[in-house]
């Protein structure tokens, strides 16, 4: 199937946009779709390790789950910080992949979880959205427009 990976610092709107995106896609399509959220994954794994090694372990687990679900025909909407580019790149050659970088200058109450080692996406195909300037609906529509183009090609 396909992966839509929403990445960005904590508080940039990943979970909010993932929920909005899933609701819009479900409303118009009969498709198997799932959200893999970083907070949910950490809760399931009981992984509260925010060191580099802990983050790599958590994201590697997410990648294994995404690979499994995509092979079962699911559209995976991923809302995980995933600070390291090499991890975000891992599935790009296996499945249709839309990377969405969410950023904002607004402080939204999670500054204590700021990932100091976050690597801003360097892929020219990555969609970049400033969630401080666009509404949830506008941001969702930006992602949906690219998703629809990719879905017709895939």
Where would I find each of the regions flagged by the language model?
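Conserved lysine of the Walker
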Residues: 14
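Hydrophobic anchor at the beta1->P-loop junction of P-loop NTPases
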Residues: 4-6
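Glycine-rich phosphate-binding loop used to anchor ATP phosphates in small-molecule kinases
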Residues: 44, 52-107
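The conserved Walker
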Residues: 10
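Catalytic phosphate/metal-binding cores of nucleic-acid and nucleotide-processing enzymes, i.e., regions
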Residues: 1
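Conserved substrate/cofactor phosphate-moiety recognition/catalytic segment
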Residues: 18-64
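Small-molecule kinase domains that catalyze NTP-dependent phosphoryl transfer to phosphate-bearing small molecules
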Residues: 103-154
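Conserved beta-strand scaffold positions in the cores of enzyme catalytic domains, especially
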Residues: 33-35, 97-101, 126-128
